Amino acid sequence: MATALGVRYSEGLYKNPFIGRTFIMPGQRARKKSLRYKLTPQFTEISEKKVMIVDDSIVRGNTSREIVRMLKDFGATEVYFAVACPPVQSPCFYGVDMPTRAELIANNKSVDEIRQYLNVDLLFYQHIDDLAEAVMRKGDHHIDRPCMACFDKHYITSEMNNKKIQQLESMRINDRNGN
């Protein structure tokens, strides 16, 4: 990204490789605590600078918001956020344990509302057509139709309707609560 923009790349946040994905951790308290151990801001790379965060996704938005707050606390003058996928609007029921629709920030807010919630100057998402094109590019393996349900709410199996989604979400909530 830095090369394409013609700017110097540097790591303003050092990542602890021993802390896992925060979006799948149970409870906001655990996610917030883990984030403090996961990322270490580098003052000289952040203070008095325009900063761009590049992340694979924004799920709930809480982790992203904390990262932005951390950068601003360390003196970033402007914060831009680039996301490598489209807004995550719906849960995946094909193997990824994701939050419910109500917990997904993009299911409830527009891109501009998310930008305001995160408190960033600019927010960029990958366009779904560009992501699909990148996934379907011919190579050793050809994919005719990738599942993009978490981005476009169009599930590839016919039995996925609103009632089924609600049932699956209820099961996940019960599992989280130990029921």
Give the role of each language-model region.
Residues 1-179:
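PRPP-associated nucleotide enzymes
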